[in-house]
Design a protein with these regions (language model features):
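Short, basic/polar, glycine-containing "phosphate-handling" surface segments that engage DNA
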Residues: 1-24, 77-81, 85, 89-96, ...
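Active-site metal-binding core of divalent-cation-utilizing nuclease and nuclease-like domains
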Residues: 2, 45, 55-93
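Nuclease catalytic cores
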Residues: 25, 29-46
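SAM-dependent methyltransferase catalytic region
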Residues: 31, 37, 54-56, 60-68, ...
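A short acidic (Asp/Glu
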Residues: 39, 140-144, 260, 469-471, ...
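Metal-dependent nuclease catalytic cores in nucleic-acid-processing enzymes
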Residues: 43-47, 115-131, 438-443, 473
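Short helix-capping/linker segments at secondary-structure and domain boundaries
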Residues: 49-54, 251-262, 337-340
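Extended, well-ordered alpha-helical scaffold/bundle regions in very large, multi-domain proteins
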Residues: 245, 249-291, 394-401
């Protein structure tokens, strides 16, 4: 910000602080609520830091610098807390930090709950830092430090400013929390490598370690209880148990399932009943048991895993976890698989192709968004929803589905932006769009999102576990921003199960080899094991509607000379 603008901002800040000081006793009353302190003081403070708090630039919703959330209170351990932070501050589509506000009556220098709540949000959101304020005080917290019950207010605290210091330390505050700091890279430089933090365990690394541990726990127990299992069946079964359980746990924090429904499970038989009820509600194939009814898991293993999904054993806030983060975690998770050794022991081994490539490297979301924008931008530009309704998008080596998540998000945002610009009133009246009460946030209806997912998004992968994860990630994504009331209304109106079945969209196969290969190598027909491993894929048979309008993705790049090390066939 030019020095003259910075000086003007300081003058406005001084006036803001003086108003607060002169009426301090009034603002300290219990009747002066959070909404009032946001409007009177918090919004103006962050506007002085350069943020477009009220979207005066008229940016599309997905590109707004600041997103406001409606307050939804839930009960946990006898106390009430909100489900989402009050504000999200973003650059482009990347969230930089959350801001949680409390009314001045709440003394955040004494009460530990607000800081702990904010840190749960920031940690689960996989953010570097987040901010807590009641305007009297402003705290910046390191959100790479995992919140643990009993943490003090000072745990993971980076900076603390009293309102009487805002003027004196404005340059310092501006240098780390301003929009200019975010755009210049100063925010990332300052908070990208915070020194001296204790117990630094970012959400993505911690949750990856947890699900790896759960996989091994389940794998060993399942083989012990079901010794006839082969390795592939074991991996798919364990993956499905994890996917279903994590899906339901995420739905709990999104108010789509009763909270602690998994925590109350005491036997595997009860879990199967829960999955059967979920299958009736959601359909989608995610909860279909197939031959798995015959397999047995020890009750104690189920109980231990489910207990670790809840506070106080862990501080997960799945309501703020981006499906893309889950996809990235699973992408690393898929580097390894369970293997049953000749002596019946279960071990976790890294896939040979991953060893050769020295590990999987995730494609960051901002990169997938850029690639998808380049691929789809020219297709969608200047067209109406009717004109793009049949555009089919595919990732032919989809892995955990992150490119498909970005593609789905692109199409949803295109529809929101088009309707806002061309037929907002009609879209709201017809239900194509809905506005979250108490906010400016507009969302595409669940029915519209489901139609997009079912008709436009397709993927193929040779790894059956990747197929399971891609479906799982896309189903989480289509539920994003949908309430239980909206889903129930959709079910009552259409008589459809809530979730789409993606078996015709996301398919298992080798996208580079079809059955014509057998004409050149007839020996394949004599080797059933080789045929199963090759997973030949006939595009015309699997996707009868024909061509795709856009192919996206970032397939594994492996030198042909190295392929023989892990796939000699």
């Amino acid at each position: 910000m030019p020095s003259e603008n910075l000086a003007a901002a300081r003058v406005h800040l001084q006036a803001l602080v003086n108003t607060y000081r002169e009426n301090f006793a009034q603002y300290q009353r219990a009747t002066y609520n959070e909404t009032q302190v946001r409007v009177d003081f918090v919004n103006p403070l962050f506007q002085l830091l350069g943020w477009d708090i009220m979207n005066e630039a008229g940016l599309p919703q997905h590109l707004r610098e600041v997103t406001h959330e409606a307050t939804v209170l839930v009960e946990e351990n006898g106390t009430h807390r909100s489900k989402k932070p009050d504000y999200s501050f973003k650059v482009g589509t990347e969230t930089l930090f959350f801001l949680e506000t409390k009314k001045p009556f709440v003394n955040i220098t004494v009460d530990r709950a607000p800081a702990f709540q904010l840190r749960r949000y920031g940690w689960s959101g996989n953010l570097k830092v987040s901010v807590l304020t009641n305007f009297t005080d402003l705290f910046i917290y390191d959100c790479t430090v995992r919140p643990v019950e009993g943490d003090e207010i000072g745990t993971a605290l980076i900076a603390h400013y009293h309102y009487t210091e805002y003027d004196e330390k404005f340059d310092e505050i501006y240098s780390v929390l301003s929009k200019e700091s975010a755009l210049s890279g100063e925010f990332q430089r300052v908070f990208g490598n915070i020194r001296g933090a204790m117990r630094r365990e970012p959400f993505d690394a911690y949750f990856l370690d947890q699900i790896r541990g759960w996989r091994m726990q389940l794998g060993k127990d399942v083989v012990k209880r079901n010794p006839e299992l082969d390795t592939e069946t074991l991996n798919i079964f364990v993956q499905r148990i994890l996917n279903r359980s994590i899906f339901l746990r995420i739905c709990e924090d999104k108010n789509l399932e009763n909270y602690e429904s998994l925590k109350r499970i005491t036997t595997y038989q009860e879990l199967k009943h829960l999955f059967a009820a979920a299958d009736q509600k959601y359909d989608s194939g995610l909860f279909e048991m197939l031959d798995e009814d015959r397999l047995v898991i020890s009750d104690s293993v189920i109980i231990e895993i489910f207990q670790s999904l809840y506070y106080p054993n862990n501080s997960y806030e799945f309501g703020v976890v981006d499906p893309y983060i889950i996809g990235q975690i699973y992408e690393l998770f898929l580097d390894e698989s369970l293997e049953i050794q000749v002596d019946g022991q279960v071990v976790c081994v890294q896939k040979p192709e991953v060893v050769d490539a020295q590990g999987t490297v995730n494609t960051p979301k901002n990169i997938t968004d850029i690639i998808v924008d380049e691929a789809l931008g020219a297709l969608y530009e200047g067209k109406t929803p009717e004109e793009v309704a049949g555009y089919r998008i595919a990732d032919i080596c989809c892995g955990s589905g992150n490119f498909l998540l970005s593609a789905f998000e692109y199409v949803v945002n295109y529809h929101i932006e088009y309707l806002c610009q061309n037929s907002l009133e009609e879209a709201l009246q017809s239900g194509k769009l809905y506005q979250l009460p108490g906010t400016q946030n507009l969302f595409l209806s669940y029915e519209q999102k489901r139609t997009i997912l079912e008709n436009l998004i397709y993927g193929v992968d040779i790894d059956p576990l990747a197929i399971e994860v891609t479906k799982f990630s896309l189903l989480l994504k289509v539920l994003e921003d949908s309430s239980a009331e909206e889903l129930d209304a959709y079910h009552a109106r259409t008589h459809n199960r809530i979730l789409p079945n993606l078996d015709e969209n996301i398919k298992l196969g080798n996208s580079l080899v079809d059955s014509n290969y057998a004409h050149y190598n007839r020996a394949v027909y004599q080797n059933l094991q080789l045929m199963n491993k090759m997973r030949m894929f006939d595009w015309n048979r699997e996707f009868t509607e024909g061509k795709f309008d856009a192919i996206i993705g970032n397939p594994p790049y492996i030198r042909v000379q190295n392929m023989v090390h892990y796939s000699p066939e």
